[in-house]
Every structure is written in C-alpha cells, then in structure tokens.
C-alpha cells in the first residue's frame, strides 16, 4: 500500500514541498471554525460569523482564478506579496475581534484576507503535475494531497477548538495560530525554487489569449458546479455540527466531531491512492458524489453526538476519493499551460459554496436550531448528485476527446 507513496516522495524535493504545502494549508481548516467560535463568543451571533466567513470566501473566489492565471505565466513566487497582504489582513481581523470593533471592520479585513490568499492546494498539485511523468503517479500524488488536506482538517479543528475554548487563552488564539502557519508555510513553500514549475512568460500569456477560456471546458464546468454545491454542504455542515454540539452542552467537542469527517476521508484517501482504478473518471466521480450524499443525509436523524460522530466518519470516506477524482478530471481535460488556473477553479467553487452554505446554515440555525442546519446539508448533498449525474455525458465526451493515457 505504501510503495506508491514512497516512490513519488523520493522524487527530488517532493517531500519538502509537500510538507511545506501542508503547513501553508492549515489555515483552511482553522480559520472558519476559529472565526465562528470567536465571533459567536464576542458578538453572540451565528449570522455575523456566517457573514464574515462568506465575505472571506467570496473575496477568495473573485480573485483566486486571476491570481492562478498570473502564476501560470509568471511563476509561483508571484504570490509572495499577496500572501503577506493576506496575513496582515488576518492580523487586522484578530485585532478587530479582540477590541470588539464594529462588524464592518471584521468584514473589510476578511475580504482582504480572502482576496489575497490564492489557492495553495492548486500550487502544490501544479508542482506534482510538473514533477511526475505518468498518470498513475499523478493519481497517487493527488490522493496524497487529498490525504494531506484531511490531516489539516483533523488537526486544525481540534487545535482551534482547544485554543478558542480554553479560558486562559484569548478567543482569537485559533486565528493567531492559523495566520502564523500561513505565513511560515507559504514562505517555506515558495522559497523552494528547484521544484517550482517554470514560468511560461509572455509567450504563454499570448497563447492563453488565443485559447478558449478555461471555463469553456465542459468537464471543468460540470466538476466545478458540483464542487460548488458540495462546498455548500461542507459549510452548512460545519456550522450545524457546532450548533448541535452546543445544544447538547458539549461545545468543546465541535472540533473533534468535525475531525471525524476528515479521519474517514484520510483513510479513504490513502487506500484510494495506493491502487489504480479501472473505472472511468466520470463514473468514479458521480458514484462518489452519490455515496457522499447518502451519508450526509443521515445527519438530520442524529439523536445524539455519538451518532453524529460515527455518521461523520463513515460519510467522510467518500470525500477524498471524490475530490481526488475531480482534480484528476481537471488535470486531464485542460491545457498544460492552464493547469494552475483549472485546479484553482475547483478550490474557488468549493470555497464559494462553503461561504454560501455557512451563511444559509447560520440563518437556519438562528431560526430552527441545529436541525435546520442539517436540513440544509441534506438539500445541498442531493442537489450535487443531480448536477453530477446530469453532467456525466459531458464529462465522458470531454475526457474522451483528451484521450487519457
């Protein structure tokens, strides 16, 4: 099972940039729940917490594809000043919460932080695409990065919850750790020039101008729309679980329960990447989305937190394989000089979905409690199924034209 992973991590510089990428991606699992807990504690409003999260992720969605397009042209170090701006804005948000500033101050800082962060996951996967030669190796690498995402989502929520709910520490301590990880991890990753994909330069800019826009790629559109709704599922789920744990008198267990999703996903990611699958990518994708919806639909019937935790672990086993396949679909279907942009569109739509799901679930929970949040999770999960199955023919046609080796 481990030989495939050992082989790719032995590539020059591979282990180092993957580790740096993991540290740089830690904020994605910490900022949302840290912000939610801190704002709810200081402002007593799930709605405001949802608004801050939504603004962060919508700002990310507005700028990330543009930044990714520039990265494909000018190289990954193009991101350094933007990431530093993101870190400074996050510090501003921490200060605003600490001194109970007007909500507008939080929203402005959140917009800047999200709008300048870029997609670190896309940068890491672009390095793997540049470093590796065969589709089988890339499949293993993308599964590994999905597993690394889940490591972040196991450690991050638990760490954030422990920090924020520990009385001697400030309620912003989770955000403080997150911004530190972002700064250190990003600079470590971007300083590794040996594995950085070569900048395409002005010639690539002219070539991109003459190409069809990446969003005219049918496979990317179907995959991105499905990920948009799945992101809504994840955003709603995060808030619903925090609300459920709070209603049961165990708010401090929120991070541990959220980590159950990631634990199941991590196990599935490692298994999925250890072998080669003979099903067509489009079939793997639509089946994965369907299984994920079936599992997510059980949460609305949860009588207690034990049920939520077990259902989360089982449902989570569909997450990493589904998103590994989604990234493979994009990697196979877009042009080589559009890979970073294509992969970023997936993370962009996921984050937009998370923001919308968080906001809608926050409203539902303020009105109907945790049950309303889990109802939002169920609706979004089956909407994703409808989109994936409706686009299966487009996926098959687009991938067939590209002729996967």
Residue ranges and their predicted role:
Residues 78-93, 176-179, 283-297, 375-378:
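Structural signature of the two symmetry-related core transmembrane helices
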Residues 22, 103-120, 228, 308-321:
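Hydrophobic core of transmembrane alpha-helices in multi-pass small-molecule transporters
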């Amino acid at each position: 099972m481990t030989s495939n992973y050992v082989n790719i991590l032995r590539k020059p510089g591979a282990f180092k940039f993957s580790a740096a990428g993991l540290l740089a991606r830690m904020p994605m699992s910490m900022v949302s729940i840290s912000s939610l807990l801190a704002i709810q504690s200081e402002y007593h409003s799930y709605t405001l917490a949802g608004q801050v999260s939504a603004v962060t992720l919508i700002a990310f969605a507005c700028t990330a594809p543009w930044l990714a397009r520039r990265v494909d042209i000018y190289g990954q170090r193009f991101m350094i000043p933007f990431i530093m701006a993101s870190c400074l804005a996050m510090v501003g948000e921490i200060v605003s919460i600490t001194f109970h500033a007007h909500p507008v101050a939080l929203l402005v800082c959140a917009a800047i932080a999200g709008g300048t962060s870029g997609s670190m996951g896309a940068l890491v996967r672009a390095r793997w695409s540049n470093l590796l030669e065969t589709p089988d190796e890339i499949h293993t690498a993308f599964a590994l990065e999905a597993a690394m995402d889940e490591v972040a989502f196991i450690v991050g929520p638990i760490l954030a919850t422990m920090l924020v709910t520990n009385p001697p520490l400030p309620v912003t301590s989770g955000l403080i750790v997150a911004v530190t990880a972002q700064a250190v991890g990003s600079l470590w990753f971007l300083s590794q020039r040996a594995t950085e994909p070569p900048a395409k330069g002005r010639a690539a800019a002219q070539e991109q101008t003459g190409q069809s826009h990446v969003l005219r790629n049918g496979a990317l559109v179907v995959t991105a729309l499905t990920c948009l709704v799945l992101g809504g599922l994840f955003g709603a789920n995060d808030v619903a679980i925090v609300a459920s744990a709070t209603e049961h008198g165990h708010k401090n267990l929120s991070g541990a329960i959220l980590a159950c999703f990631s634990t199941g996903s991590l196990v599935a990611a490692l298994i999925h990447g250890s072998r080669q699958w003979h099903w067509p990518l489009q079939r793997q994708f639509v089946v994965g989305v369907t299984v994920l919806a079936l599992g997510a639909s059980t949460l609305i019937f949860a009588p207690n937190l034990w049920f939520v935790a077990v259902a989360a672990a089982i449902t989570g086993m569909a997450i990493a394989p589904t998103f590994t396949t989604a990234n493979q679909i994009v990697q196979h279907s877009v042009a080589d000089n559009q890979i970073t942009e294509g992969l970023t569109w997936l993370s962009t739509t996921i984050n937009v979905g998370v923001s919308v799901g968080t906001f809608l679930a926050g409203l539902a929970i303020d009105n109907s409690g945790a049950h309303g949040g889990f109802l939002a999770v169920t609706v979004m999960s089956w909407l994703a199924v409808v989109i994936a199955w409706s686009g299966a023919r487009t996926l098959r046609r687009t991938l067939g034209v590209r002729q996967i080796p």
